[in-house]
Amino acid sequence: MAEAEEQETGSLEESTDESEEEESEEEPKLKYERLSNGVTEILQKDAASCMTVHDKFLALGTHYGKVYLLDVQGNITQKFDVSPVKINQISLDESGEHMGVCSEDGKVQVFGLYSGEEFHETFDCPIKIIAVHPHFVRSSCKQFVTGGKKLLLFERSWMNRWKSAVLHEGEGNIRSVKWRGHLIAWANNMGVKIFDIISKQRITNVPRDDISLRPDMYPCSLCWKDNVTLIIGWGTSVKVCSVKERHASEMRDLPSRYVEIVSQFETEFYISGLAPLCDQLVVLSYVKEISEKTEREYCARPRLDIIQPLSETCEEISSDALTVRGFQENECRDYHLEYSEGESLFYIVSPRDVVVAKERDQDDHIDWLLEKKKYEEALMAAEISQKNIKRHKILDIGLAYINHLVERGDYDIAARKCQKILGKNAALWEYEVYKFKEIGQLKAISPYLPRGDPVLKPLIYEMILHEFLESDYEGFATLIREWPGDLYNNSVIVQAVRDHLKKDSQNKTLLKTLAELYTYDKNYGNALEIYLTLRHKDVFQLIHKHNLFSSIKDKIVLLMDFDSEKAVDMLLDNEDKISIKKVVEELEDRPELQHVYLHKLFKRDHHKGQRYHEKQISLYAEYDRPNLLPFLRDSTHCPLEKALEICQQRNFVEETVYLLSRMGNSRSALKMIMEELHDVDKAIEFAKEQDDGELWEDLILYSIDKPPFITGLLNNIGTHVDPILLIHRIKEGMEIPNLRDSLVKILQDYNLQILLREGCKKILVADSLSLLKKMHRTQMKGVLVDEENICESCLSPILPSDAAKPFSVVVFHCRHMFHKECLPMPSMNSAAQFCNICSAKNRGPGSAILEMKK
């Protein structure tokens, strides 16, 4: 009955722990699996008592005195019947070629697995531990230690005899030993000792902390992290010890090495085993808990923790409760933790079970993320480690992610992820589209559908377009604009739009979309008609892009009404396709539009539309008077008489003045300025432009009885007409506004003219003198005359061949030379001689500068 209660309590606590583990969001660091195959068969009839691990195989000892060699999958490869009682410990050297075994009946065996080498000894007390030298395979290292009531070192002598030496005794049974390099560490009832096999010295003693615990029930756990770091676990205490070299000055009678405890901390549970994992520790803990129902203590599942040692405490990295067979009946001494350094494998050994813990790989990490429904993180992890993952495929994870998002109702995110996950797989795309159709979410996936590489079946795109056409005209129009026309059957969609227009014929969105569909279908005429009806800005682009000028010859007025600027620019840019004559004829009933076209044509080229210049006079007068005068000034083809007639009819004074002056009737023009405009400044400006004395006289005569005009003339006439002529004609007693200022200005202008003349005269005299001096210097220069020069008249050498004969040569400044007798005699009016070639004028540049005689 008590046993049943215990089992019930154990199962209850197990389920509680499992629920807690499920709720935990922290990913485990290790994964676990039972060592099965041959191990399962062994433990059904026997119980495990110890195990040791090599990189190549495992060695398992049992309570019935058997030793089994196993492969890493747990298959039995060899079996040794060592003793009829419990195997206490198995030890292997680093090569895995030699094995040491000790048992409860005092038997010790050390033998070669692949050689006939063997040692047998039976002691009179149980042998609890054995450790062979790590390099036992070497002839110089044939050593091993055993421990019962004392620690013995066995060493083979030169005659192949084994001799033993006592390393330690008197402190109770030796219960644990670990040999690493030249150091042996063991634990007895009092504490932990370390022995240096080279110096034959014991270098430390680390006492145990909790002496209240029975050492046979709570044995010490030892493991070497490296050749100089020993980790000790006993009870709930963990110590990390570092073996260091002692300085020569501190030697005296002390060992050459000493031990320093670099980290020490307490754990929550009793320690059954230790193993290193990089800079962390793996700790197997024996757990006892009190049942809430019965308030009795029971054995709970053992725990495997990864902890980070600190100087005086530790940080828990992960903690897993292990469900091993028969854990309710086990004690702390029944658990062992063995490890394989090469592969970071940890073996949890109990009498009825062997569990293997290993570091989780990327596949395990992805499994955990998928289990926690962290699909996006799982997908990212798979993409980063795609070369290392073996059990997962990126596509499968992605599809699971999409399904998860759909189930959660995140349709837009699911659709967006399809782009990345489905890639170029057309079949998967089509499958997902149908799945979105089934849940009524085609709109969600529509923005992300592939539009090329891959291209899906036309039916897929048509299905989505129909979905939008039924419920969302704007969305439908957007898809038509964005999707290439070759993705779907255009005629099917056109017919569907027409059917909808029968219900709503004035829907601008549908009409515009239909025009775009017509454009894709190259039915440009229908598209243009719709665009013009809608007055859509794309109409000009459509005409240009598809060269539809032949289709718009009868639609020019519509285009001009829509956007006259763009329409005129287009028509003028394409005169070769639609002639000026055709445009003017089409606009005959709309003179205001006709004017806009002809005005822009005139701006571009004054001569192209010359046949319409007469018509333009009336158009400018009617619709655009500000541009009439510039037109009259720039046009050389408009009839002046017609223009004058129109301007006079409309009383356009400025234009009439310009036309009169252009026709040579300046007096009438001036008279109109004076009489119609009463603008003396404009009259003066006009007189200045014409520069005609008679006009000035008329202007003076008209202004003489008008004081304001006289003031204007006095202010502006000074540089064109002598002011005295005006002043003499002013009647005495006439009051003239600002007369004094005007006279002062005249005098100032006169003084300015005098100053300017004097300044100009000075400049002229200075320049003349400078040029005269320059000419004089030039004329004073000598001229070379030699045998190569000829007479320009007779063309014979200028110098005679006989230098003794007398000769006479005339040289001009122009460098022409003549014999004196070849020159004509000077005239009676002027004694000067001139070069016959260069000048016939008096005192020209060819006047003689030198006469040579001999």
From Swiss-Prot:
Q: Which CDD domains match?
A: RING-H2_Vps41
PROSITE patterns referenced in this protein's UniProt entry, alphabetically: CHCR, ZF_RING_2
Please give one Gene Ontology molecular function term for this protein. Answer: microtubule binding
Q: What are the CHCR repeat spans here?
A: 568-712
Task: Using the record for this protein, list the coiled-coil segments as residue ranges, or answer none.
Answer: none
Keywords for this entry?
A: Autophagy, Cytoplasm, Cytoplasmic vesicle, Disease variant, Endosome, Golgi apparatus, Lysosome, Membrane, Metal-binding, Neurodegeneration, Protein transport, Spinocerebellar ataxia, Transport, Zinc, Zinc-finger
- According to the UniProt record, where is the region Disordered? 1-33
Tell me which GO cellular component terms the UniProt record holds: clathrin-coated vesicle; cytosol; early endosome membrane; endosome membrane; Golgi apparatus; Golgi-associated vesicle; HOPS complex; late endosome
- List the expressing tissues: Expressed in cerebral cortex and cerebellum. Highly expressed in Purkinje cells.
State whether it acts alone or in a complex, and with which partners, per the record. Component of the homotypic fusion and vacuole protein sorting (HOPS) complex; the core of which composed of the class C Vps proteins VPS11, VPS16, VPS18 and VPS33A, is associated with VPS39 and VPS41. Interacts with RILP, MON1B. Interacts with ARL8B (GTP-bound form); involved in recruitment to lysosomes and probably hierarchial assembly of the HOPS complex at lysosomal membranes. In vitro can self-assemble into a lattice. Associates with adapter protein complex 3 (AP-3) and clathrin:AP-3 complexes. Interacts with STX17; this interaction is increased in the absence of TMEM39A. (Microbial infection) The interaction with STX17 is decreased in presence of SARS coronavirus-2/SARS-CoV-2 ORF3A protein.
Query: What further fact does the record state?
Result: Protective against both alpha-synuclein and neurotoxic-mediated injury in invertebrate and cellular models of Parkinson's disease (PD); the function requires the AP-3 adapter complex and the HOPS complex.
Record's protein name: Vacuolar protein sorting-associated protein 41 homolog
Q: Organism, per UniProt?
A: Homo sapiens (Human)
Origin organism lineage: Eukaryota, Metazoa, Chordata, Craniata, Vertebrata
